[in-house]
Amino acid sequence: MVSSNQALLISPSIPYGEIAVPPSKSHSLRAILFASLSKGTSIIENCLFSPDSQTMLTACEKMGAHVRRIGDSLHIQGNPDPHHCHPPYFHMGNSGIALRFLTALSTLSPTPTLITGSHTLKRRPIAPLLSSLKQLGAHIRQKTSSSIPFTIHGPLSPGHVTISGQDSQYASALAITAALAPYPLSFSIENLKERPWFDLTLDWLHSLNISFLRDQDSLTFPGGQSLESFSYSVPGDYSSAAFLASFGLLSSSSKPTILRNLPSQDSQGDKLLFSLLKQLGAHILIEKHHIEMHPSSFSGGEIDMDPFIDALPILAVLCCFAKNPSRLYNALGAKDKESNRIEAIAHELQKMGGSVHPTRDGLYIEPSRLHGAVVDSHNDHRIAMALAVAGVHASSGQTLLCNTQCINKSFPHFVIAAQTLHANVRHYQADFPLRSSFCR
């Protein structure tokens, strides 16, 4: 695990090997939430334990769930009627999913709940979701119209609302709330982005026997439904797998990199990234439960980022090694993640010699030889791991990557995984705090 006083020192190396991909963050958080709202005891195997998972677990315990951890599994006795023991506040840490999902669920209770979180969470948009909840009757008091903190409570009124699709979590939050509401609710999504991630939420609801009608991007929930307990094993995280895959894809080794625990039928959005790379010429074998990467060259091109917008940082790194220029577009939502990922990855790769330029909704990237440099994560786990891949495949020089504690958000054992694949990534303990001015 990466601690707050450490950076990473990265040297050019030749990765290869075989490894199990860590559990999916998106599935883990949904599994915890749904188990906590179900009748009976649910068992979640192979759960990801990270700061976001702990945020969700703490919130669910406040709603009356009883949680036992046994090894890498969770036994959760749910509270199917959390409306009558709703907590006075939720601290969302730095979790965008917890912020959006629990904000919406709070409107099922008539008791006001304070929604707050870390300073960095204030940059995550919430206004479009609040606007739709207000139209359904939610009572909201806030100091600013765009961020935490605020208080919110219901009840909502039966009806129909239109919600922004600029971030798929808004629609997912409303779908989960409508699924559990005691009255009918329906909504239409305007210009849905990140569609695979919304579909992932609907897949969960369908698997838990929640009934709803869907007409393209309009959904109707009849009301009065509840969740039953379940057993579930969390699959590997395709988003995290993208970084491990990139170690192998860009390697000069003659040996493949094999990533296990990646079921091919899973609905995670970033799974589509691997199909894209195959289309661009990468030598990738997608099997039923694993993916095999062979070092290979590939083309750049015009790439619509919407299906896998979280992959923008690592795809920017990969495109530096493509045979021709690339334009990543339709990625406006990347500006509102843990960092402005468009600006952040361009700025840091430019330090390494990359020809990476922000555009209105993405990046323009020309093939470049990268070199080692002092770079910064911008406190964003995906920026950090993408830069680690860039450092491993730099043509010369070491890379000092600062502020790497953020990696714990989705991949606490990233350094161990990189080393397992023979990537020269190691902890660097500075004798002094690595200030932003030094790293940037």
Curated annotation (Swiss-Prot):
**Compartments where found:** Cytoplasm
Record-linked SUPFAM superfamilies: EPT/RTPC-like
Its annotated pathway? Metabolic intermediate biosynthesis; chorismate biosynthesis; chorismate from D-erythrose 4-phosphate and phosphoenolpyruvate: step 6/7
- Broadest EC class assigned to this enzyme: transferase
What EC number(s) does the entry state?
2.5.1.19
Q: Which InterPro entries match?
A: Enolpyruvate_Tfrase_dom, Enolpyruvate_Tfrase_sf, EPSP_synthase, EPSP_synthase_CS, RNA3'P_cycl/enolpyr_Trfase_a/b
Function, as annotated: Catalyzes the transfer of the enolpyruvyl moiety of phosphoenolpyruvate (PEP) to the 5-hydroxyl of shikimate-3-phosphate (S3P) to produce enolpyruvyl shikimate-3-phosphate and inorganic phosphate.
Which residues take part in binding 3-phosphoshikimate?
Answer: K25, S26, R30, S168, Q169, D310, K337
One cellular component term (GO) for this entry is: cytoplasm
Q: Where is it chiefly localized?
A: cytoplasm
Coiled-coil segments: none
Q: Which reaction does it catalyse?
A: 3-phosphoshikimate + phosphoenolpyruvate = 5-O-(1-carboxyvinyl)-3-phosphoshikimate + phosphate
**Residues engaged in binding phosphoenolpyruvate:** K25, G96, R124, Q169, R341, R382, K409
The protein in question is named: 3-phosphoshikimate 1-carboxyvinyltransferase
Q: Which family does it belong to?
A: Belongs to the EPSP synthase family.
Provide this UniProt record's keywords sorted from A to Z: Amino-acid biosynthesis, Aromatic amino acid biosynthesis, Cytoplasm, Transferase
Q: Which Pfam families match?
A: EPSP_synthase
Known NCBIfam families for this protein?
aroA
Q: How does it assemble?
A: Monomer.
Keyword Amino-acid biosynthesis set for record: yes
What is the source species? Chlamydia trachomatis serovar L2 (strain ATCC VR-902B / DSM 19102 / 434/Bu)
